[in-house]
């Protein structure tokens, strides 16, 4: 499957997960906080207005033939992600985001995981370790905007490291 994780206010709480597979089956939910922090998921949240397109070069569930690939496009409406946050799509704002691809290549074998921004574990529910989505208001290729990390990023990373150290003991 392919998974998208979005934390619009970058606080590690009230974030969204949207998954799809090669058949186009959607699984979407909102989490109040990560599972390892005692988080709860809300599967009743359906990403309103979500549009997806799946393209498959090969067959599904026929292990005897050779498949090439499958791809997905998603259009996620901004309005669907406005629950519990106030960080609009405005130049200079950042969101935390990550992408994950999980594939089972061998029967009874372990899954293979690819991610956009590694979290250091096989656990995507670590929003503090996701990448940054930085909004600009300029046309692509017309300027060299530089990503400005949040002013408190060093403290933020230290506090999360302390949190994980407590969780691991």
Segments the model singles out, each with a brief description of its role:
Residues 1-163:
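Structural preference for beta-rich elements and adjacent junctions enriched in aromatics
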